Amino acid sequence: MQKSLVSLAWVFVAILGAICLGVLALHKGESINTLWLVVASACIYSIGYRFYSHFIAYRVLKLDDSRATPACVRNDGKDFVPTDKAITFGHHFAAIAGAGPLVGPILAAQMGYLPSILWILIGSVLGGCVHDFVVLFASIRRDGKSLGEMIKLEMGKFVGMIASLGILGIMLIIIAILAMVVVKALAHSPWGFFTIAMTIPIAILMGLYMRFFRPHKILEVSVIGFILLIIAIYAGKYVSLDPKLASIFTFEAGSLAWMIMGYGFVASILPVWFLLAPRDYLSTFLKIGVIGVLVVAIVFVAPPLQIPKITPFVDGSGPVFAGSVFPFLFITVACGTISGFHALISSGTTPKMLAKESDARLVGYGSMVMESVVALMALVCAGILHPGLYFAINSPEVSIGKDIADAASVISSWGFSISAEEIREMTKNIGESSILSRTGGAPTFAIGLAMIVYHILGDPSVMAFWYHFAILFEALFILTAVDAGTRTARFMIQDLLGNIYKPLGDLSSYKAGIFATLLCVAGWGYFLYQGTIDPKGGIYTLWPLFGVSNQMLAGMALLLVTVVLFKMGRFKGAIISALPAVLILAITFYSGILKVMPKSNDSVLNNVSHVAQMQIIKEKIALTTDEKALKTLQKSFFNHAIDAILCVFFMLVALLVLIVSVRICSNAYFKNQIYPPLAETPYIKAA
């Protein structure tokens, strides 16, 4: 009887979710209540976790708690430590939930709310959550090895070496785009810059406090750090109101890029306990706390989505990012649905912390469910804004101009009527000098959060504080990701350089570490700086390249797991990784090809393609006589050439992994030949 009631309850959940999703898809009004989205997502995620993740865990992967995990076998109290699954879940979620789920859906909102909602909900349950879960499983069974090492073991040394080069390149693009989000949020914002600058001495104070005064008191020091952050936000307001202080803390995007490069270099060579660890604790508590409060606030306020279900920009003519709904929506949403970056985390620190194999279900699948919830919240923050305001914030200066009146006129001509006064009022309410062309996701998310708080408290004067709190919240964990990403990429560079000159691969060598860090920062710093001087704002051209590379990395990770499952003889079960791998690679190969197509009569495709842009710029160079304009065009030509080369390189790496994967799987299925042999570690019984 009880079993029947439970089954009926799940049937009700499924029907309720389908009805809510149907309402979102078929609604024809100007706005729709966000509660339809909240209920639909709760139902779909519940069903996905309860049934699909259970099927994967016990019918496909066959998780075995009697088998000792790497954390138990190699417990050293440092890198390998068996940890409670709730703590491991928090660590893993904090590590994967970077800027991606906040930025991608906000950019994709230019096409309307419906395409993003469908892709986030369906794609994450069947693709992204599966990706994180199965890569974590593969790493657990291989002594916690990294993605590159696992590809080398399961597909051969040559493929592993090429894949490692590709992974490093993708990592540098990821760090650059993370830093770009911070630059876009802090440019010309003395309040924001002062607050973020204060987090450095606060983090150092926390590190010293925990190292020498109160060791291991993580909660205590995080509370102290949080109080100091709130004080810094309040102080930032008075800094912005004082003309002299405001001028000291106001910087152009280019200057901020150099500062972040310097910060990334210094932070990644300092001892972890001095800056990175305390900042990580603080950002983790902030991240989980803010997201939890925001979910409750959205349910409580239930603001209407004002952005249309589908906008005219599905054809790719939108100002925020280049490309049509297929395939560029998928690579734009990126981390909100599936992210190759997560494969690096799922094969990094997390597999070294799991106490039992069954914990991988909550940590791997469950954390990605939470990340896609963050993506939906970001979409809500963008969607509740007046569409005209959304485009004012996210359209590049070259499209709408510098003047508020001009921007309002241009945006209104697109069919999203807004007055200059409405833009000025929002600018004043959040305590900024301008909100025009602040593409990057962070300002849009922050304004959306501030508006939700305003609806609760009913006082517009609170918006400035909550806007800057949200900027602090985002910048804090993004800069933590920049620290950690630079450190991780440094290890990758040293591993590769060690094959050329052995001393450079010595991780204990301070000089080798500094040299590798310089190469790393130069790599991502180049893309960051070029993005800041890009006339379209950097995000317009960098984010699609990030999306293509990130999704290709996810495809390669899923191919690795498919190879592993075929070697284990689980041919039918391998469809759980093979199907999303084929879909993701098909989408990214198509988008990658479009990005290197020659010039055509289609203006949308020309905006997407780096090669087409090179041809257009070459024509302009031939007609330009002004020396300054000529230098700008030559720089732009060079940048597009680099982006095109990288795009082709990433596609070739993914194609190599795909070909080798097909060969290994076909040999295993048709000839029963397993080569290279399965690299799974021997079974050791758990204590």
Swiss-Prot record:
PANTHER family, per database record: INNER MEMBRANE PEPTIDE TRANSPORTER, PYRUVATE_PROTON SYMPORTER BTST
Alphabetized UniProt keyword annotations: Cell inner membrane, Cell membrane, Membrane, Peptide transport, Protein transport, Transmembrane, Transmembrane helix, Transport
Membrane-spanning parts: 6-26, 29-49, 87-107, 117-137, 162-182, 190-210, 221-241, 256-276, 285-305, 325-345, 373-393, 440-460, 462-482, 513-533, 546-566, 574-594, 642-662
Name used for this protein in its record: Peptide transporter CstA
Family listed: Belongs to the peptide transporter carbon starvation (CstA) (TC 2.A.114) family.
GO BP annotations, alphabetical order: cellular response to starvation; peptide transport; protein transport
InterPro entries referenced in this protein's UniProt entry, alphabetically: CstA, CstA_N
Organism: Helicobacter pylori (strain J99 / ATCC 700824) (Campylobacter pylori J99)
Described function: Involved in peptide utilization.
GO cellular component terms attached to this protein's record: plasma membrane
Location(s), subcellular: Cell inner membrane
Topology relative to the membrane: Multi-pass membrane protein
